[in-house]
């Protein structure tokens, strides 16, 4: 199994369009030759074809493979001013140009919708994209998202598989988000059984860690942290359960990290003598590289332990 990285933490260092090659070079320097490419809405609002062609050229020259992509996150049932169908059509075309075989497109929800309403609405939504999917040849992956405060019903592998099966089209598959799954109580979501339930529909992973689910009386809050495995005292994803599931289903995709370290996405501001101080807001790039070299080594250890690592 190949290791992969979604280099989203570099969004805070660089212009993801103008500095595209630099981002790819840094990712490769950490050991990763497979990536999960994040398609920005700003690309789709401009000359996205030129950006896609340039990305393809850079990937080829640098020896990097984009095994999967992520579309802009838009709630199709409350899209605001965004034309979500146009955004998703362009996202699929973007992938077609670059040669990315599959893309994650999130489901949507309405406040307090029932499970039946959630399923019916999303079946109609995803089926509306079948013509674009067939035209481009790019698979659409559904991802498990949400937590107990939301009205999403993709809490575990069985529910995700239920929606995919209802779509009844061979080009729909699953992206299992390991960290999202960890936000639920184990009785509602468990890594091994979820991966097994997805079976041959599982095409991609988002691997990251968090503090998981705690009862409301506990001192920690649930939060989608996207941290590196093993670095937090309360990190609680059971990677043995995940890995055994991948082994048992013969998973063929990449082991893709979607970590947002070492850049903190949220930080209270500090003002001193009338100026906002940001000296320690983020690590310098050499330290970013060291941390993500460590991430690669952690992934290699995990895969080698289960006999899955492909150099």
Identify the residue ranges that each predicted region occupies.
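Histidine-acidic metal/acid-base catalytic patches
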Residues: 1-7, 14-31, 60, 99, ...
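Active-site-proximal loop/turn and secondary-structure-junction residues that shape catalytic pockets
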Residues: 9-11, 39-41, 72-75, 107-111, ...
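N-terminal substrate-binding region of glycoside hydrolase catalytic domains
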Residues: 26, 31-46, 70-73
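Residue-level detector of anion-binding/catalytic polar loops
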Residues: 33-34, 65, 101, 139, ...
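Conserved beta-strand positions in the central sheet of alpha/beta enzyme cores
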Residues: 36, 68, 104, 141, ...
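Glycine-rich, proline-tolerant flexible connector loops at the mouths of alpha/beta enzymes
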Residues: 36-59, 113
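Active-site acidic/histidine proton-transfer and metal-coordination neighborhood
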Residues: 58-61, 77-174, 183, 279-282, ...
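The substrate-binding groove and active-site-proximal loops of carbohydrate-active enzymes
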Residues: 73-81, 116, 226-233
């Amino acid at each position: 199994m190949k290791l992969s990285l979604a280099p989203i933490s570099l969004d805070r260092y660089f212009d993801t369009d103008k500095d595209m090659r630099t981002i790819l070079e840094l990712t490769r320097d950490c050991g990763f030759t497979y990536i999960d490419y994040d398609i920005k809405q700003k690309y789709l609002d401009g000359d996205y074809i030129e950006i896609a062609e340039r990305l393809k050229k850079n990937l080829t020259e640098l020896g990097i493979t984009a095994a999967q992509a992520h579309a802009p996150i838009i709630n199709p049932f409350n899209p605001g001013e965004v034309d979500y169908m146009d955004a998703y059509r362009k996202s699929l075309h973007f992938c077609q140009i670059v040669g990315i075989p599959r893309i994650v497109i999130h489901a949507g929800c309405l406040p307090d919708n029932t499970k039946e309403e959630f399923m019916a609405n999303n079946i109609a939504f995803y089926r509306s994209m079948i013509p674009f999917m067939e035209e481009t040849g790019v698979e659409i992956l559904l991802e498990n998202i949400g937590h107990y405060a939301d009205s999403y019903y993709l809490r575990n592998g069985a529910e995700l598989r239920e929606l995919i099966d209802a779509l009844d089209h061979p080009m729909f598959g699953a992206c299992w988000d390991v960290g999202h799954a960890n936000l639920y109580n184990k009785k509602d979501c468990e890594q091994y059984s979820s991966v097994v339930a997805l079976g041959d529909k599982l095409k991609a992973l988002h691997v990251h860690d968090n503090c998981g689910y705690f009862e409301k009386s506990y001192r920690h809050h649930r939060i989608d942290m996207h941290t590196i495995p093993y670095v937090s005292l309360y990190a609680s994803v059971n990677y043995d359960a995940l890995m055994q599931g991948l082994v048992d289903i013969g998973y063929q995709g990449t082991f893709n990290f979607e970590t947002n370290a070492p850049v903190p996405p949220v930080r209270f501001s500090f003002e001193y003598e009338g100026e906002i101080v940001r000296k320690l807001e983020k690590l310098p790039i050499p330290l970013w590289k060291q941390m993500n070299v460590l991430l690669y080594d952690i992934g290699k250890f995990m895969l080698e332990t289960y006999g899955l690592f492909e150099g």
